[in-house]
Amino acid sequence: MKKILLIIMLLFFANPCLAIKIGLLTDTDNVPFGTSVFGTITDANTNRTVVDIEAMQGYEIKPYNNVMAIKIKGKYYKINSDNIVIKPVSFGYVCTKSKWYRGFLRIQNKGGKLTVINDVDLEDYIKGVVPAEMPSGWELEAHKAQAVAARSYAVANLGKRAGLGFDLKDTPDDQAYGGASAETAKTNKAVEETQGIVLTHDMKVITAYYSASAGGQSLTASDVWGSNLPYLRSVPSFDDNIGKKGHGVGMSQHGANNLAKQGYNGYQILQYFYKDVTFAKLNPEYYK
């Protein structure tokens, strides 16, 4: 097998702690939620605690004029804020959309409709992306390639949805994200063993596009979007037995798994699908 020289650079960013904001819901009229442990609701505008939350209890937030109301044991109570944060007070999870999430929830009243955002550390976010984007039963090295590609996409696209108040959606419009409910021991291992690793080209983190399958030959960015991204070239995608699913640019997920079965490691898979890239490690200050 072809040997590769793995060069890891250290990227420095001004922000001392990298978190990401993921849009879970927009333009909704009610938000059921809960926490796995005791928690609080704070007014994000004043940082004042407005409600204490019991563990494993169901609650609901609705818009009320320009602020919000919370349903507690069948009764609604006004919360004089248009921007609240729901957070466990110790290690625990928050729940909405019938899923558990790490980090905390932010709910905003925007013109009488609610937006729900999961504020979460980057690595915890990637733990919820890998099993949502790639079957957990696939090869570990394919999961590692997926983790690095997903992390690169996320970092390169921070602020992409800033007009909506968050960075990325939780859907394949950006990256599928299932929160802590989607996590498995195997996919978490892939994330942890590649912690902080991203793909760069010309000292910039790349938007590492990927799709389910390319149907035998991947496409270039100019083929699909008319933009020239030199690290996205057309290569045999090792998924000939799978019909094309998705845009076909960058890494084929089925192809990545097939290469892993042939003995390629995660980094070799990435260097096959993304050309002239360097592996870089995010500043460890992010993880303090």
Question: Residue locations for each model-derived region?
Answer:
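Conserved, single-site charged/polar hotspot
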Residues: 5-288
